[in-house]
Amino acid sequence: MSDSRKEEIDKLEKSKIYCQNLTKEELQETYASLVEENFPDSKRIHFIADLGRSPEIAFHFELICNDWEEGTDLNFEASFDQHGQAGIDYLLETLNQEEVESQRVLIVYLLAKILSKARHRDFYASSCKQVLPVLISLLPSSEASNCRKLIIALGWIGSIGEIEILGQHLLTDQDALCRAWSASSLMQLSFHQVKKEILMEKTKDLFCEAITEEKDLQACALMIEAAQVLFGKRWIPTSAVEKLEIEKIEKARKSAIRFLKK
């Protein structure tokens, strides 16, 4: 091993030990200085990394909640997955104690997002099973913006049993983006807990009906895009989805329907 490589490893190890020994008071002090400086990107990103490697899970979550409440989009949740199983357990306990629905939705979404990154960890499946009942219970009463988050989260932690729920939202939800994200989440299941072949078999008719009947152009484009990823096709370019190019979307719709009806 070269000297430069040894130095790099030694530096990383020292950084890890430093972060593991960070106290709440030290993190609070750094946070206060960032507030005064209006959160310059480089320092904010470094602080976020330190939060994730520190043992101060409760303080980390406190900052995330402040960010949610103030709508500042400081992205403190980006490193929460670094807390591993301990972080998941903390969020599950917090979720069980939380009574405000909007906050429960945000916690469920954060849990699902973290678990999506941890799908190869041994705690993934068991943790998903704990979050799913809460997520599903929140879906019927949630307003559109919260429902969208929950539908996206369902794609990250759902299993074969959730195909029907997503299918219902795909075909009957009154919100166009909820319908669109349902298609995306069905596709996402193939990257998580459902085998692609099984998912293709169970969703082919759903996608065909949804794409055929969809009146909202953006939702239709997003459905086609999700379906082409799942079924390995190239019906529509990303640029056409982003720019909502009517002619290309309608052409892709015809191609998708023709394939899905086979």
Which residue ranges define each predicted feature?
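HEAT-repeat alpha-solenoid elements in large eukaryotic scaffold proteins
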Residues: 59-71, 104-115, 140, 180-186
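Eukaryotic tandem repeat interaction scaffolds
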Residues: 142-185
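Amphipathic alpha-helical scaffolding segments comprising HEAT/armadillo-like alpha-solenoid repeats
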Residues: 25-28, 45-64, 85-96, 117-139, ...
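Alpha-helix N-cap/helix-start positions at coil->helix boundaries
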Residues: 69-70, 100-102, 144-145, 175-177, ...
